[in-house]
Amino acid sequence: MMAKTILRVLLSRPCFRRQFCTSGQSTSINPEEIKKFDNLSSLWWDEAGEFRPLHSMNSLRIPFIRNGLVNSRAVSTTKANTSRSLDGLDLVDVGCGGGILSEPLARIGANVLGLDASQEAIQIAKQHSLLDPNLSGKLQYRHGTLEELAEEGKLFDAVIMSEVVEHMNNPQHCFNLAAKLVKPNGSLFVTTLNRSYLSWLGGILIAERLLKIVPPGTHDWDKFLTPLEVENMLADSNCNTRSVHGMAYNILTHNWHWTSNVSINYALHAVKSGEKGSN
């Protein structure tokens, strides 16, 4: 029983997350994935529940995004360690769910648009944001798709795709759309699962087939992307990878830490090439 509990914590992920981009067509949503997610939407802000690893992951995601923006010169080094380090920057959180990442980004000054294909998730996110009056005017949520947002022509200082790409049917199409949203010299941040023996062993064989911690078929290992594949896809979208770091989850403390091993989880930062004549 203890082994099952530990593995369940380790492998619990937003496995029912939305698929934003299934093809190059206008429809980019998988209704079955949406339905699964809608049934669990009320769990987003239970920090000791199914989404505990995502809440804990913010301890890495927030500084990773901030430091990436410093390295790309969107944020000055003198401003980096202030409480409003992202003040004035426009960010879009693709697949924002209930707002676990969107809210803390807004709290350090960013103007954040949370985008999600689940209307239930957006409602949860909106309701929770009302609990903090300081988020007013800094955080907006929208039910929609990347295609719809890209058609509007608005540009952002950074696009964040955290724990989303492993559920895409057509990741190149999604990266192309995401890149269209990024300003020249702007950033794109990705966190996801590697397609490796270790990720198959833990996420598929043990969790789904042996212990049945999560329903069989929850994860599709073939959809996991290696860091090199993501780098190449982003390069085709005119974005150059600046850094890749492995992430590891401690099943006893429920904390994440950085590691040189990218076999299971990793974070990637890319920068969109500037227009001709830009510095």
What is each PLM-predicted segment?
Residues 6-7, 11-51, 55, 59:
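N-terminal, positively charged/glycine-rich alpha-helical extensions of SAM-dependent methyltransferases
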Residues 77-84, 89-200, 228, 268-270:
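Conserved SAM-binding loop
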Residues 199-209:
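Short, flexible, mixed-charge acidic loops at enzyme active sites
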Residues 212-229:
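Acceptor-substrate binding/catalytic loop of class I
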Residues 239-251:
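Conserved S-adenosyl-L-methionine
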Residues 255-279:
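Core SAM-dependent methyltransferase catalytic element
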